[in-house]
């Protein structure tokens, strides 16, 4: 029998499973299950100050309990340290114009769909279950004055996000730094 293992970031207890999660299978022979792989979008800056959106894997999962007697689950500890958690609701037709993220931050849509467009022209639409890491603080204005990323709502109505800001410096030229 095939069992689906729910995998995702253990950042927020109400985080739904990403549509981009690859689940492990149990062959029924008491063999260890293969760890899952899930994905996030990384908005990062290169050494020329240009932002990019790259789809990145998370795949260093271990099967363990979060707290006994709970059953084991796949977890991948990505960050340990100070963080700030913010719930945001972007109004209908919200347009974020070109801007940088204020901090290195994970952004998790809970309701509705929004988009991020990097300076290189890559545009990604994200909805519930998708995960984004915003780290474009070290971008430089291009010829049109664009810096960071363009963001806005795709769907009608409000878009609800959970934002987890990390107390750490942004990197440069490190796409997919959380692996």
Q: At which residue positions do the language-model features occur?
A:
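N-terminal secretory signal peptides that target proteins for export/translocation
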Residues: 1-3
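Bacterial N-terminal signal peptides
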Residues: 7-18
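A short, N-terminal "cap"/entry segment at the start of jelly-roll beta-barrel domains
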Residues: 23-82, 176-179
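Conserved short histidine dyad/triad with adjacent acidic residue
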Residues: 58-61, 68-71, 83-101, 126, ...
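Short, Lys/Arg- and Gly-enriched loop/turn segments at beta-strand edges
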Residues: 64, 139-151
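Short, conserved beta-strand element in jelly-roll/cupin
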Residues: 89-90, 100-116
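Short acidic-glycine-tyrosine-enriched beta hairpin
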Residues: 120-138
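A short hydrophobic beta-strand segment most commonly corresponding to one strand
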Residues: 133, 146-170
């Amino acid at each position: 029998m095939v069992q689906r293992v729910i995998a995702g970031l253990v950042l927020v207890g109400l985080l739904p499973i990403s549509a981009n999660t690859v689940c492990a299978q149990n062959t029924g022979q008491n063999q260890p299950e293969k760890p899952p792989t899930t994905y996030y979008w990384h908005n990062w800056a290169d050494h020329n100050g240009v932002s990019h959106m790259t789809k990145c894997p998370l795949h260093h999962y271990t099967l363990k309990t979060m707290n006994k007697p709970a059953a084991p689950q796949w977890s991948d500890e990505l960050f340990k340290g100070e963080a700030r958690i913010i719930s945001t609701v972007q109004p209908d037709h919200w347009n974020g114009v070109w801007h940088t993220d204020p901090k290195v931050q994970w952004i998790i849509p809970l309701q509705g769909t929004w988009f991020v467009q990097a300076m290189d022209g890559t545009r990604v639409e994200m909805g519930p279950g998708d995960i984004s890491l915003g780290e474009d603080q070290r971008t430089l204005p291009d010829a049109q004055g664009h810096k960071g990323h363009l963001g806005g709502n795709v769907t009608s109505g409000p878009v609800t996000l959970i934002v987890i800001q990390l107390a750490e410096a942004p990197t440069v030229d490190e796409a997919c730094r959380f692996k």
